[in-house]
From Swiss-Prot:
A motif (Nuclear localization signal) lies at residues 8-12, 376-380. GO terms for cellular component: mitochondrion; nucleus. This is Endonuclease III homolog 2. One of its GO terms (molecular function) is metal ion binding. It catalyses: 2'-deoxyribonucleotide-(2'-deoxyribose 5'-phosphate)-2'-deoxyribonucleotide-DNA = a 3'-end 2'-deoxyribonucleotide-(2,3-dehydro-2,3-deoxyribose 5'-phosphate)-DNA + a 5'-end 5'-phospho-2'-deoxyribonucleoside-DNA + H(+). Disruption phenotype: Greatly increases spontaneous and hydrogen peroxide-induced mutation frequency. It comes from Saccharomyces cerevisiae (strain ATCC 204508 / S288c) (Baker's yeast). Changing residue 26 to A: Abolishes interaction with MLH1. Induction: Constitutively expressed. InterPro entries: DNA_glycosylase, Endonuclease-III-like_CS2, Endonuclease3_FeS-loop_motif, HhH-GPD_domain, HhH_base_excis_C, NTH1.
Length: 380
């Protein structure tokens, strides 16, 4: 998967809106007033953000465990309809928040509260439960340790792969474990160790780099047994020691596996949008890791988890890398990267009655929910 504004009048829907220094050729000293986040300090101060008791989590029963994870990493779109206030944007570093953040982000959250996107239906966080349910394994029967493993495998499969294909690959492995290996729990460490690597590669052929990923998964399974008490690591160093696992996957796995919000998960959508809106330095932030470190300087910890889900879904359906729908975007009156010609020709711009505009937008929301993302797709 690849990847100035001028004043004008138009109709729109109103919206109420440590000491390890990061060294890189892209990050030179004294070029910005805000220093990049210090990784050691974040880990040292985790208790201030509600650090977790790993032994306590391991002892939780399935229902208790999933309630705990849900309380830490809520993906309920209904919570995104409420605008974030300036008071909520206070951060520990005292760093200045980009002026465009709240006007744009509040509108993006509102849009995300209305539509269901691929990441909501088939993203990594949904895969273990969705696949288990599809295979007849009820949520309350999913062992937390297996859930954590299945989530990790899902993230490894997801690299440079669409959510739908990743979900299919996870389903293929699960069905093989159930039907061929006769493992009632689906994907387990024992099952992954028993599957021959060529067989595993064939099961996940629908994802990109499936041969390499099969090798990574086999090696990871053995490492978890040898070095991590047959469970996933609970710190970023341990997670990153696994083959094929990078920071994006690592922080997301810590979030959904242990409820530990130790860093922001920055994928291609988050990286692209944050640079486009100048929330991070678009010149210095050449990689997702650069973007993550800059974001963590000023973004309040309370938003570290949700920003990934919010922006990924927005980037999948409304502000794609190619074919942006500025004509349908509620943030097109505050966005610095809007397409003026597209907006001028839109139905929103032509309509004079706000009620009609809301009606058109509601109809568009219905089509998106039903899986149709653009008028171009409908014509095809």
């Amino acid at each position: 998967m690849r990847e100035e504004s001028r004043s004008r009048k138009r109709k729109h829907i109103p919206v109420d809106i440590e000491e390890v220094e990061v060294r890189s050729k892209y990050f030179k000293k004294n070029e910005r007033t805000v220093e990049l986040v210090k990784e050691n300090k974040i880990n040292k101060d985790l208790q201030n953000y509600g650090g977790v008791n790993i032994d306590w989590i391991k002892a939780l029963k399935p229902i208790e465990y999933f309630e705990w994870i849900e309380s830490r990493t809520c993906d309920d779109p209904r919570t995104w309809g409420r605008p974030i206030t300036k008071e909520e944007m206070i951060n520990d570093s005292g760093a200045k928040v980009p002026e465009s953040f709240l006007p744009i982000y509040n509108r993006v959250r509102l849009m995300r509260s209305k539509v269901k996107t691929p990441v909501d239906a088939m993203g990594c966080s949904m895969i273990p439960v969705l696949v288990s349910n599809k295979c007849g394994i009820p949520s309350e029967k999913v062992d937390p340790k297996n859930f954590r493993l299945q989530f990790l495998i899902g993230t490894m499969l997801s690299a440079q792969t669409r959510d739908e294909r990743m979900a299919q690959a996870a389903l293929n492995i699960t069905e093989y474990c159930l039907n061929t290996l006769k493992i009632a729990e689906g994907i387990t460490l024992d099952g992954l160790l028993k599957i021959d690597e060529p067989v595993l590669a064939n099961l996940i052929r629908c994802v990109s780099f499936y041969t390499r990923k099969a090798n990574f998964i086999k090696r990871t399974a053995q490492l978890l047994v040898d070095n991590f008490d047959s469970d996933i690591p609970y710190d970023i160093e341990g997670i990153l020691s696994l083959p094929g696992v990078g920071p994006k996957m690592g922080y997301l796995t810590l979030q959904k596996g242990w409820g530990l919000i130790a860093g922001i998960c920055v994928d291609v959508h988050v990286h692209r949008l944050c640079k486009m809106w100048n929330w991070v330095d678009p010149i210095k932030c050449k990689t997702a890791e650069h973007t993550r470190k800059e974001l963590q300087v000023w973004l309040p910890h309370s938003l570290w988890y949700e920003i990934n889900t919010v922006l990924v879904g927005f980037g999948q359906l409304i502000c794609m890398a190619r074919g942006k729908r500025c004509d349908l975007c509620l943030a097109n009156d505050v966005c610095n990267a809007r397409n003026e010609k597209l907006i001028e020709s839109s139905k929103f711009h032509q309509l004079e009655d706000k009620e009609d505009i809301e009606k058109v937008y509601s109809h568009w929301l219905d089509t998106v929910t039903n899986g149709i993302t653009t008028e171009r797709h409908k014509k095809k």
